[in-house]
Amino acid sequence: YDRTNNIYSLSLAEKELQEDDTLLIESDLIFDDTLFPMIVDNPYPNLALVAKYETWMDGTMVRLDEDNNIVNFIPKKAFRYEDVDLYYKTVNIYKFSKEFLRTQYVPFLNAYTKALGNNEYYEQVLRVITLLDHCELKALPLAGQKWYEIDDVQDLDIAETIFAPEEDRLPLYQKRYGGYWRFPNLLDFCYLVNPYFPNTRLKEELKANFDNLLTEY
């Protein structure tokens, strides 16, 4: 357990992966039930559900072309804040066809683990496949459907608020005594802010002097 990662867990199911079409779902997710028919009923055989990047998201990102083909997987160590407008977060729900698994994913999975070991992520195999000239993996962006990845107690608390019945949600927000920034889609009309300050020029000046401001004051 302390020497492997999810690429090893998936490799244990190598035989079963090649027997039929597969839905791959990570176990730390909570999500709207509509995501299942959304991906299953889509006619494209190899899909990854993705969501436009928001500040709470962590882990593997992807970049898409105009046809929603995945052109690159961006691992956590290659994340660049200056590119966040181009990023989509993998929801970690995938649909793979038997043919794709048999002819591409499993062979690359075996080669990857032999070369780099078992302490890796299965998304890295997908990253290699996207470098091929004829990659068959597309993205299916969400359109506001709820989902959350739960890694700790704080994530669980946020997810319980997001998925609470509408009539219970406001009291749960208010129990937090702030921290609304963790909910990017929440508009807080009681928060005392000046929508005209800072202006764009001042923000650019602060960015330009950020290193000095951070380290010398």
Outline where the language-model segments fall:
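Conserved alpha/beta core of the MobA/IspD/sugar-nucleotide pyrophosphorylase nucleotidyltransferase superfamily
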Residues: 87-175, 181-183
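Short beta-strand-to-loop acidic/aromatic patch adjacent to the donor-nucleotide binding site
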Residues: 20-30
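Conserved N-terminal catalytic core of the sugar/cofactor nucleotidyltransferase
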Residues: 1-20
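Conserved core of the sugar-phosphate nucleotidyltransferase
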Residues: 32-116
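Short, well-ordered beta-strand micro-motif
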Residues: 63, 95-97, 149, 188, ...
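Short, acidic Gly/Pro/Ser/Thr-rich loop/turn segments
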Residues: 56, 80, 101-103, 147, ...
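N-terminal "arm"/small-domain region of PLP-dependent enzymes with the aminotransferase-like
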Residues: 164-216
